[in-house]
Amino acid sequence: MSFRGAPRGRGGGGFGGGRGGGRGGFQQRDMGPPATVLEMGKFIHACEGEMVIESTNPKVPHFNAPIYLENKTAVGKVDEVLGPINQVYFTIKPSEGIQATSFKYGDKFYIAGEKLLPLERFLPKPKPPPGTVSKVKKPSRGGAARGGRGGPGGGFSRGGGRGGGRGGFGGSRGGGGFGGGFGGGRGGAPRGGRGGFSRGGGRGGGRGRF
């Protein structure tokens, strides 16, 4: 059974990408297909009117990035990023007139190269070797020490919020943070028994069983 809501606590373990965040601001205009496209993933199954895709690209797609067929026909946009960081999945919200059920297992989807982010951007940064950290000077008399900048935030979330933890994409619709992998999603994963993608943090209660 897969639930749409994820707890707000640290947890994590996956990209919980989603639709959070404000939608204000300027809307990007459709500039047509790019000059070249790169293979992004293959169709697994349809779920709730969207396509669940297994990524075949070592990079991570932007949210709302346009997705194309090999002939550069636009079919939709990236809606959510799911799964563990070593096996990324994502969903495509189809464009008007496109049916998610019209595709079959293994069909390939493509993306513009500028709509990709390196996975390393979302991994914890290695600690510097011992002895390379400079010592902090003691404050002079009468002066208070300046506050530090705080720990690295990390995160790949479309909306700010409480979600997430360390080491991966945290919450989804409004949740933030980096949580150890892509958390949750739609439908069941192609491998591994009953487990499934949960839709990532956000709207609360589950929708029952897919």
Swiss-Prot record:
Signal peptide: none annotated. This is H/ACA ribonucleoprotein complex subunit GAR1. Non-catalytic component of the H/ACA small nucleolar ribonucleoprotein (H/ACA snoRNP), which catalyzes pseudouridylation of rRNA and is required for ribosome biogenesis. This involves the isomerization of uridine such that the ribose is subsequently attached to C5, instead of the normal N1. Pseudouridine ('psi') residues may serve to stabilize the conformation of rRNAs. The H/ACA snoRNP complex also mediates pseudouridylation of other types of RNAs. The H/ACA snoRNP complex mediates pseudouridylation at position 93 in U2 snRNA. Keywords: Nucleus, Repeat, Ribonucleoprotein, Ribosome biogenesis, RNA-binding, rRNA processing. Belongs to the GAR1 family. It comes from Chaetomium globosum (strain ATCC 6205 / CBS 148.51 / DSM 1962 / NBRC 6347 / NRRL 1970). The gene is GAR1. Its main location: nucleus. Component of the small nucleolar ribonucleoprotein particles containing H/ACA-type snoRNAs (H/ACA snoRNPs). Residues 141-205 are annotated as: RGG-box 2. InterPro entries: Gar1/Naf1_Cbf5-bd_sf, H/ACA_rnp_Gar1/Naf1, Transl_B-barrel_sf. Pfam families: Gar1.
